[in-house]
Amino acid sequence: MDYSFDTTAEDPWVRISDCIKNLFSPIMSENPGHMPLQPNASLSEEDGTQGHPDGNPPKLDTANGTPKVYKSADRSTVKKGPPVAPKPAWFRQSLKGLRNRASDPRGLPDPALSTQPAPASREHLGPHIRASSSSSIKQRISSFETFGSSQLPDKGAQRLSLQPSSGEAAKPLGKHEGGRFSGLLGRGAAPTLVPQQPEQVLPSGSPAATEARDPGVSESPPPGLQPNQKTLPTGSDPLLRLLPTQTEKSQGPVLKMPSQRARSFPLTRSQSCETKLLDEKTSKLYSISSQVSSAVMKSLLCLPSSLSCAQTPCIPKEGASPTSSSNEDSAANGSAETSASDTGFSLNLSELREYTEGLTEAKEDDDGDHSSHQSGQSVISLLSSEELKQLIEEVKVLDEATLKQLDSIHVTILHKEEGAGLGFSLAGGADLENKVITVHKVFPNGLASQEGTIQKGNEVLSINGKSLKGTTHNDALAILRQAREPRQAVIVTRKLTAESMPDLNSTTDSAASASAASDVSVESSAEATVYTVTLEKMSAGLGFSLEGGKGSLHGDKPLTINRIFKGAASEQSETIQPGDEILQLAGTAMQGLTRFEAWNIIKALPDGPVTTVIRRKSLQPKETTAAADS
């Protein structure tokens, strides 16, 4: 080979070409595996022009017989030209020299100057360089400019072709590509790349595939391990196919859950949640009512809506009218159930004593209310045998006094639409003066009014299995609002009778509450006496405070004197006492007025003597009371 043009090594133009080659060397030396990927002649030839410094610097100057390594070290002392753009004349000579050097090292085996990856790349590049020797410089430059763009599809094709060959390497690659594939679907990637990746993504690592395995889709991974060629033509269809199968399989357990839960509802679960607190704060009466309420509510929620609604018309039979009985609630229940059979029904807790485990047969044959028996059987049929056994055992061990109180407790079940109210409002709470939560008002066209069991002034023990004992007013209202959502509502109420609470006309302060038994006995045996007294109206008022009135927290009650202010004229004269009912004030009747209206009347009175008519209960049978008024 003629190396005459290399003998003039001191020519600055030749040295500039070496600098240019060294400038390209960092780019080409990083990826030595890119050379065999180029099949075209022009591209491989440009690899020859720039590939010599790619990991093989010693072979660049083998024509001079000295390694490039040592010459590059002395390059700092050699005179260099300015870094100007190359001209076609010397650039053509440099290309010819590079072709000669590329073909020559095959016949010059120098172990000190050659490395292992270099001969393999040279063998591939040699034929291509000779085939493209007749190409022009402009074609070479254009091929070099398109080097980066022409390499990407070839390299991507080679990587895709190598993935099916290695099984272990394809799995992590599929997981990595799965995230990229899911992102490409959301961004609207090109359709040419989408069908190539789902076959590796969906079975192994995509989020849709992992979610499909969680509930009960253990059958989905084996088909995902089949060859990828079967899933290749489907494109993005596997995503659409996995979603309906996932929803269908996830809906399977949901449809089965009601039947499983309806068969097994241990009453101990409700005891562990509610009766532990009830045993500490309340009596067995509240615990039994809460158990019945929670058990009935859970059973109603487990039943399909069609079955739970279909039970209601079957409760009363042939419009049976109730007969007279000792309990007023049973008569009210019978008439309400016959008139409003589609709104709900109720059960008296005392009827638990009359039922056996057969759920429909009574222990004793009563000639009483048939419709109440039908409603009782309907409620009992909602309970499981285990729950009913335990309830019957708990009722049997109760004493007679507690059993009498069970007569006043009713479990009312209302059927309604979703979002509809129950038809009554609440009053009282642990944070108010009236600690007991009662029914404040029953709306005329509401569900409670149509059913007929829930009356104004009844104590509300629980709503939908949630006990209201000891709750604040806001918490009770929140429980009442939550009852709007389900189609059924279970309300446990107790009618406040003379035996269960103080007289409605008595005061509810601490002293009167402590003497509840005495107030009851006084009311039953003594007669109220009407007095006419004269009070002194001053700038501060009449010297006492009022309670009760229409629409109060305790319901519609008469206006009574709550307490007498110290230093007032009425205190010194002792003409009035706390608990006295005000009938008339300065010729104005006070019956049926709210407390606010009564105060407006008092404020409008002129200063001076005011004639007042009061009614006071006589305290003659004081000896028969258990405790005396203070």
Curated annotation (Swiss-Prot):
Residues 321-343 have a biased composition (Polar residues). Residues 404-500 are annotated as: Interaction with PPP1R12A, PPP1R12B and PPP1R12C. It comes from Macaca fascicularis. The modification Phosphoserine is found at S220. InterPro entries: IL-16 (IPR020450), IL-16-like (IPR055287), PDZ (IPR001478), PDZ_sf (IPR036034). Residues 129-143 have a biased composition (Low complexity). GO terms for biological process: induction of positive chemotaxis; leukocyte chemotaxis. CDD domains: PDZ6_PDZD2-PDZ3_hPro-IL-16-like, PDZ7_PDZD2-PDZ4_hPro-IL-16-like. Residues 30-268, 316-343 are annotated as: Disordered. This is Pro-interleukin-16. Pfam families: PDZ (PF00595). Gene3D superfamilies: 2.30.42.10. Residues 410-495, 532-617 form the PDZ domain. Homotetramer. Pro-interleukin-16 interacts (via PDZ 2 domain) with PPP1R12A, PPP1R12B and PPP1R12C. Pro-interleukin-16 interacts with GRIN2A. Pro-interleukin-16 interacts with GABPB1. Pro-interleukin-16 interacts (via PDZ 3 domain) with HDAC3. GO terms for molecular function: CD4 receptor binding; cytokine activity. Interleukin-16 stimulates a migratory response in CD4+ lymphocytes, monocytes, and eosinophils. Primes CD4+ T-cells for IL-2 and IL-15 responsiveness. Also induces T-lymphocyte expression of interleukin 2 receptor. Ligand for CD4. Pro-interleukin-16 is involved in cell cycle progression in T-cells. Appears to be involved in transcriptional regulation of SKP2 and is probably part of a transcriptional repression complex on the core promoter of the SKP2 gene. May act as a scaffold for GABPB1 (the DNA-binding subunit the GABP transcription factor complex) and HDAC3 thus maintaining transcriptional repression and blocking cell cycle progression in resting T-cells. Keywords: Chemotaxis, Cytokine, Cytoplasm, Nucleus, Phosphoprotein, Repeat, Secreted, Transcription, Transcription regulation. One of its GO terms (cellular component) is cytoplasm. SUPFAM superfamilies: PDZ domain-like (SSF50156). SMART domains: PDZ.
